[in-house]
Amino acid sequence: MIEPEAVLGLLDYEITTIERHGGGIRISARYSGPISCPHCHGTRLRSKGRYVRRVRQESIGRRACLLELEGHKWRCLACRRQFRQRFPGILPCQRASEAFQRMIFGQHLDGINRSRLGKREGIGAATVERYFQRGLQRQFSEWHSRRCPLILGIDEHFFTRRKGYATTLCDLRNHRVYDVVLGRSELSLESYLQRLEGKSAVRLVCMDLASVYRSVVRKHFPNARIVADRFHVIRIVNHHFLNCWRELDPVESRNRGLLSLMRRHRHNLKPEQQARLAAYLAEFPGLDLIYRFKQRLCYLLLKKHRTRKQCQLLAVRFLKAIHQLRQAGLPQLVSLGETLHSWRNEIAAMWRFTRSNGITEGFHNKMELINRQAYGFHNFENYRMRVKLLCG
């Protein structure tokens, strides 16, 4: 005996016939469950005739499946309204069951383009897109919470040349993308952040040294502590140091071997590399002092898991280093000192809180892969929904 639920994936259906139809299968069935009025939910009904509804059903193997459902036209004796019978698993005014739409959604999500999938299943490319959009909306309502996460990561990434950059909001606690917003200026983010729920519950926000994002967080997340991303802080220290080196020695600063040695932390150098670097720095005593200062500053910034009392001692050393940079007299070092002074509170929070934006940067790599697989996105909302589904 054929189990209707095993074939159709739907409850309370009775299969009357299964026959070959062209190159596919045609299944005739009827609904045997309870029927009620969709207007008043009354059960006192009078039949006004029969009709047959034909919809596409999920394919069986590689053969397309057509589902023919025998239904009734009913008149409710309570509210005196007439209606056609509704079938569970098939939405009103739809030519395909929910199971078939989920199948199209899954195949399109796996990378089959709309035109090829439409030709294979005998539907239009626009219909494939419509089923896909419905599937995305259904997944969002099931998976994504509207409230803002407690630990948030904010960073920017490039979208298109015409529309520019987009801002990524990442849930650092649960390792998923919370949302993607077009734009990176305070004006473009204003309307979105005003509608955001649960902003007062956010406790920590991690970001790079972007003044725009800092002002946005201070305005819209009043209870959040801002923590600078360690990678970006050390990168900006190296950036100013290398620019200062180019001003002091324009010739040797182009040497890729020396450039690699200058950029690394001292503990990552092999003994022969340390000897080569020491021989070069011996020729420039002033550059040697700057290099040693940079190494001490980087080691100071690399510290983590510190107590409150330990952070107070580190803060004294950090403020002293900032003062020395601002009094150095070299433009690149003075600029670095001003930047660190402007971000001193957010940088000091790195010693106490170990959260970083590495998770967000990793999702940016995945988002770039999504963009390449789709050969680019013109519609930002399509891109946003695809990212939230695959990275959320």
PLM region spans:
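Active-site beta-loop-alpha junctions of metal-dependent nucleic acid enzymes
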Residues: R95-A96, V177-G198, L204
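The DNA-recognition helices of helix-turn-helix-type DNA-binding domains
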Residues: G124, G135-Q139, C244, T354, ...
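Short, positively charged, Gly/Tyr-enriched micro-motifs
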Residues: R54-K163, K199-V202, I347-A348
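Short, conserved DNA-binding cores of transcription-related domains
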Residues: M1-R81, F87
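Short alpha-helix plus adjacent loop in nuclease-associated cores
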Residues: V233-E252
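Gly-rich Lys/Arg/Thr-decorated short loops/hinges at beta-loop-alpha junctions or inter-strand turns
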Residues: F87, C170-R176
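Acidic/histidine-rich catalytic cores and adjacent linkers
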Residues: R30, P34, H39, R46, ...
